[in-house]
C-alpha cells in the first residue's frame, strides 16, 4: 500500500466523506436543525422516503474499506504472510499489516453505522460515535509507529498527517459528551477534509513529484515547502467549507421561496397591505381629532353667551 494508489485512494474517500459532512452540517446550521436526528427524515413520507433514511456515510465507509482491503491483499505478489518459516521466525510486511488493520476498522465502523441506523429499532448514537473514535485512536497509534523508519520529506509529510489525526481524535472524544454541538461537527468536518486532501498531496510528493525528480531529504527548503503546502491545504479547505455553506444557504432560500404556493404569497401580501392601510387610517383619524379639539374649546364660550 506504500504507493501512489495506496495514498490517493484513502485521500479521495476522506475528501468525499468530508464534503458530505460539510453539506449535512451546513444544512443543520441554516435550518437550525438537529445533526443526529434531522427533521427531513421524519417529515419525508413520500416515494423517496426510504432513500433518505439510508445510512449514506456508513455505506460509503463499508464500500471504501472493503475495496481498500482487497487492494491491500493484492499488493503483495507472494501473498500477505504473517511470519517467515525460517528459524528463528520473523514477522513479514509490518506496514502492510498496519494498512490492513486501518481498513478493517474503517469497514467495521461503517457496519456499525449501517446497523444502528437501518437495522435496529432505536438508533444508538453513542455506539456509532464510539466506533469512529476507536478507529481514529488506532489510526493514530499505527501512524506513530509507521514513521519510525522515515526521514526527511517523508517524515515531515507524515508528521503533519499525524497532527491532523491527533486533533481529530480530540474532537471526536469531546463529541462523546456533546454529540449535538455544532462547533465540534464543523471542526470535525474541516479536519476530515484536511486529512483527505493532504493524503492526496502526499501521494504526489512521495511517489509522483510534479518536477519528475524525487524530493531531496537533505535540502531544508524542501521541508519548509512541504509545511507551506500543508498551510495552503488548510486555507483551501476552510474556503471550501465557506463556499459549501454559502451555496447551501442560497439553495435553501430559493427552495423555500419556490415551495411557497402563489396563493399563500398573495394572502400574505394582502394581509400585510391591509394591516398597513388600517394603521395609517387610524393615525389620520387620531390626527383629525387632535386638530379639532382646540377649535371646540374656543367655540364653547361663545355658545354659552
UniProtKB/Swiss-Prot annotation:
Pfam families: DUF716
Membrane-topology descriptor: Multi-pass membrane protein
Keywords (A to Z) from UniProt: Glycoprotein, Membrane, Transmembrane, Transmembrane helix
Subcellular location: Membrane
Residue ranges of the region described as Disordered: 285-305
Any one GO cellular component localisation term in the record: membrane
Glycosylation (residues): 32
InterPro entries, per database record: DUF716 (IPR006904)
Stretches that traverse the bilayer: 4-24, 51-71, 100-120, 124-144, 159-179, 187-207, 223-243
Entry similarity comment: Belongs to the TMEM45 family.
Protein name: Transmembrane epididymal protein 1
Gene behind the chain: Teddm1
Amino acid at each position: 500500500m506504500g504507493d501512489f494508489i495506496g495514498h490517493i485512494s484513502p485521500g479521495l474517500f476522506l475528501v468525499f466523506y468530508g464534503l458530505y459532512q460539510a453539506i449535512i452540517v451546513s444544512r443543520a446550521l441554516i435550518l437550525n436543525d438537529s445533526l443526529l436526528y434531522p427533521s427531513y427524515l421524519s417529515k419525508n413520507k413520500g416515494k423517496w422516503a426510504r432513500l433518505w433514511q439510508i445510512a449514506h456515510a456508513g455505506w460509503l465507509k463499508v464500500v471504501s474499506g472493503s475495496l481498500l482491503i482487497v487492494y491491500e491483499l493484492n499488493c503483495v505478489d507472494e501473498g500477505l504472510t504473517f511470519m517467515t518459516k525460517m528459524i528463528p521466525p520473523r514477522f513479514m510486511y509490518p506496514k502492510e499489516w498496519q494498512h490492513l488493520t486501518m481498513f478493517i476498522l474503517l469497514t467495521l465502523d461503517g457496519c456499525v453505522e449501517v446497523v444502528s441506523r437501518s437495522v435496529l429499532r432505536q438508533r444508538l448514537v453513542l455506539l456509532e460515535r464510539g466506533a469512529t473514535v476507536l478507529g481514529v485512536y488506532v489510526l493514530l497509534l499505527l501512524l506513530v509507529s509507521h514513521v519510525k523508519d522515515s526521514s526527511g520529506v517523508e517524515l515531515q509529510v507524515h508528521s503533519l498527517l499525524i497532527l491532523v489525526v491527533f486533533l481529530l481524535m480530540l474532537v471526536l472524544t469531546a463529541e462523546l459528551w456533546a454529540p449535538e454541538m455544532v462547533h465540534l461537527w464543523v471542526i470535525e468536518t474541516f479536519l476530515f477534509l484536511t486529512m483527505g486532501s493532504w493524503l492526496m498531496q502526499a501521494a504526489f510528493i512521495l511517489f509522483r513529484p510534479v518536477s519528475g525528480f524525487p524530493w531531496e531529504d537533505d535540502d531544508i527548503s524542501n521541508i519548509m515547502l512541504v509545511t507551506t503546502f500543508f498551510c495552503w491545504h488548510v486555507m483551501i479547505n476552510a474556503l471550501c467549507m465557506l463556499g459549501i455553506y454559502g451555496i447551501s444557504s442560497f439553495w435553501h432560500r430559493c427552495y423555500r421561496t419556490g415551495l411557497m404556493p402563489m396563493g399563500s404569497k398573495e394572502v400574505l401580501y394582502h394581509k400585510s397591505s391591509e394591516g398597513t392601510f388600517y394603521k395609517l387610517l387610524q393615525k389620520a383619524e387620531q390626527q383629525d381629532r387632535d386638530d379639532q379639539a382646540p377649535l371646540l374649546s374656543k367655540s364653547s364660550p361663545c355658545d354659552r353667551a
